[in-house]
């Protein structure tokens, strides 16, 4: 699975209506794949979203049966990998997330 730009795009600087629409659109698409099995998924994990950096990633991992997840959209900010590893929300799927060192040349 490759999410492309499909993500729960919440932005602190946007108005509430925009973020509500982003929430609606993301959850509508996720409902189409709820519970499906994926061997590998490439998912946005975007530090530019600040506190909401992992909303879409977390939702995907909790609502699908994904064997391995590869973060993308992290703009070479590899610190987001450790941030996710330290995030209590990731505990159920932490071992399935690719490690930052796998990306480095």
Q: Where do the language-model regions lie?
A:
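Active-site-proximal loop/helix segments of hydrolase catalytic cores
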Residues: 1-62
């Amino acid at each position: 699975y490759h999410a492309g730009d499909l993500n729960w795009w919440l932005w602190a600087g946007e108005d509430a209506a925009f973020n509500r629409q982003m929430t609606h659109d993301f959850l509508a698409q996720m409902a189409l794949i709820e519970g499906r099995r994926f061997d590998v998924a490439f998912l946005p994990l975007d530090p530019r979203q600040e506190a909401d950096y992992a909303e879409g990633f977390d939702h995907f991992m909790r609502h699908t049966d994904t064997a391995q997840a590869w973060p993308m959209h992290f703009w070479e900010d590899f610190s987001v990998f450790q941030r996710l590893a330290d995030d209590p929300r990731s505990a159920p799927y932490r071992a399935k997330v690719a490690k930052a060192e796998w990306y480095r040349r």
